[in-house]
A protein has these predicted regions:
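Hydrophobic/aromatic residues within transmembrane alpha-helices
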Residues: 35, 46, 50, 93, ...
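C-terminal transmembrane-helix exit sites in multi-pass transporters
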Residues: 57, 62-66, 92, 109-131
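Specific transmembrane alpha-helical segments of multi-pass solute transporters/efflux pumps
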Residues: 65-103, 115, 141-142, 206
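Hydrophobic alpha-helical transmembrane segments in multi-pass integral membrane proteins
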Residues: 87-95, 140-153, 192-206
């Protein structure tokens, strides 16, 4: 009985955390769309501020807990680039995409990408994963199927696809880390580096 109660509590905790993550994930899209649609800030500046503020917050949290921070200049560049890819494509896609549509596409692509990565890693697909990938793929097909009463920019949809792939790979790489907070902080510093490089090209050529 105690084991069953513990399992129920763990499942409820997991459901609660997943629900909370989904709420923040969806709110992220709503706030991004609200910011970019006003045209008071461009997509790159919005992305740069997001990465900079995230880096500052995570660095502060890590230093508060561990009193010091050591950034490894030789690792986490792929993880950092994937986070940057997620963030920059996410912002530019919302120039011409509704928040709800973008969220649905992002959720589906992230799920599909993570399952594909799992398959390449020789992980076995459970029934739940098969149901999940079927729902995600079916939802994408329904959403993107041409209809007279609904139109969508396929270029901005492509950007959201890239954003979802970037987030999925970033998450998979982070899963392998022994210290999630340190790994995420280090990756964000690398993402900030890629944002600065992109910013130089943005200022010079756009």
């Amino acid at each position: 009985m105690k084991i069953d109660e513990l399992e129920v509590k763990n499942n409820l905790k997991l459901i609660g955390l997943i629900s909370l993550a989904l709420v923040f994930f969806a709110s992220n899209s709503i706030l991004a769309r609200m910011a970019i649609s006003t045209q008071n800030i461009d997509a790159f500046s919005f992305t740069f501020l997001r990465i900079l503020s995230a880096t500052f917050i995570l660095t502060s949290v890590y230093i508060y807990k561990n009193k010091n921070l050591k950034i490894d200049l030789k690792t986490n560049y792929l993880s950092g680039f994937m986070f940057f890819l997620y963030a920059i494509c996410f912002s530019y896609s919302y120039i011409n995409m509704l928040a709800g549509i973008g969220t649905l596409i992002l959720f589906a692509v992230v799920q599909l990408s993570m399952i594909i990565v799992a398959l390449f890693s020789n992980e076995k697909l459970s029934v739940k994963k098969v149901i999940g990938i079927t729902m995600a793929f079916g939802g994408l097909l329904y959403l993107l199927y041409p209809r007279n009463d609904f139109s969508i920019s396929y270029f901005h949809t492509f950007l959201m696809f890239l954003s979802g792939i970037g987030w999925a790979i970033f998450s998979v790489l982070g899963k392998k880390s022994q210290n999630a907070t340190l790994n995420a902080t280090d990756s964000l510093f690398k993402a900030l580096f890629f944002a600065l490089v992109f910013g130089i090209f943005y200022i010079l050529f756009f």
